A protein has these predicted regions:
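Intrinsically disordered, low-complexity, repeat-rich regions
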Residues: 1-93, 100-178
Length: 178
């Protein structure tokens, strides 16, 4: 319906340009998420990433991202505070991760917005809705010029993905192949 012009989205708002926060507030007692070997995270946008903000699947994804040579950085998107997608339902979608892949050492050429889902949620109506929204977002990003997305996005690929607990690693391997 969107492509046949039977349905249109009307965007109303004041601020459309998401920027990563310059700092984050954490509880003084919060424990930091470290790599599996106990070392500090190296590719996270922030040095301190609170471990209690991750479920087990999200931790596994973060550790996986830490080991990727093509990764420029990854960011744990905080629910109800950071980047969100407003679809046709009342509540916004807050993806779990935003990360960038690169072909060079000093810039990135791909941006990924990723939502992870446990096995028990994979066939839910909410997950189906998120898949539909992410598919629309990916198609819209592909059809937009860098002038519409902003100069910083010139020649960048943007993909939105919902990854199931039992397939996230295989999908990320495909996405991050050189």
């Amino acid at each position: 319906m969107l492509y046949s012009d039977q349905m249109r989205f009307l965007v109303i708002g004041e601020k459309f340009d998401f920027t990563f926060p310059k700092s984050t507030k954490v509880k003084p007692t919060a424990k930091t998420l470290n790599r599996k070997d106990g070392q500090q995270l190296q590719l996270s946008l922030f040095e301190f990433v609170p471990e209690d903000e991750f479920n087990e699947t999200e931790k596994a994804v973060a550790w996986y991202l830490e080991g990727q040579k093509r990764l420029f950085f990854w960011y744990r998107n905080r629910s109800r505070r950071d980047y969100a997608i407003q679809g046709w339902r009342k509540h916004k979608i807050y993806p779990d991760f935003i990360f960038t892949a690169t072909g060079s050492e000093d810039d990135y050429d791909q941006v990924y917005i990723v939502e992870t889902k446990g096995i028990h949620l994979i066939d839910s109506k909410d997950t189906d809705y998120k898949r539909k929204m992410f598919s629309i977002c990916t198609k819209e990003a592909e059809s937009r010029s860098w002038a519409e997305l902003g100069p910083a996005m010139k020649s960048k690929v943007i993909r939105f993905e919902v990854l199931a607990e039992d397939e996230w690693e295989a999908k990320l391997n495909q996405m991050l192949q050189a």
